[in-house]
Amino acid sequence: MPQLNAYLSFDGNCAKAMRFYTRVLDARLEALITYGQTPADMPTPASHADRIMHAYLVHPDFALMAGDTPPGIPYQGVSGVMMTLTYPTAAEAQRVFAALAEGGNVTMPLGETFWADAFGMVTDRYGTPWGVNGGARMQPPK
C-alpha cells in the first residue's frame, strides 16, 4: 500500500530538529546518516561532513523524513506547506502544541473550532509550520 510521507529540509540543524521531534511526538529515530558517512565514490565537502543527509523518524501512526540541504543547494526554508497532527483529545493536542511552541512562534493560539475541540498553528524553533488538532468533530456544534 502506498504511503505519503513528508520530507523536511534544514540548514545544518536537522539532527537537533529530529531529536526534538522524536521527543515531542513520542517517536523513534531510526536513521540519522551524515553526508560524511556516504560511500567514498560520493565525495562530500568537509563543510557538510557532519550535516545530515537522511533522517528517518517513525511513530506507530506516521513517519517523518528529513535532511540538511545538499552541498551547493541553498536552503530556502519552508513555504506553502504545513505539517498537521490530529490527536483524539484536546489535552493531547495541548501537550504537543505547547512543546512545539517552546522557542517558536504561535500564529494561531490553540482554541476551540467548529471542527475540533482544539486547533492551533505554530512555527517551531526550527522553522517548520504545524497545525495541531485535538478532539476532532464530524459535525459543527449546534
Stretches with model-predicted labels:
Residues 52, 78-80:
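Short, solvent-exposed loop/turn segments at the edges of secondary structure
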Residues 5-7, 82-84:
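Short aromatic/hydrophobic contact patches that present stacked aromatics
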Residues 8-61:
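Core segments of cupin and vicinal oxygen chelate
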Residues 2, 30-33, 44, 56-58, ...:
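Vicinal oxygen chelate
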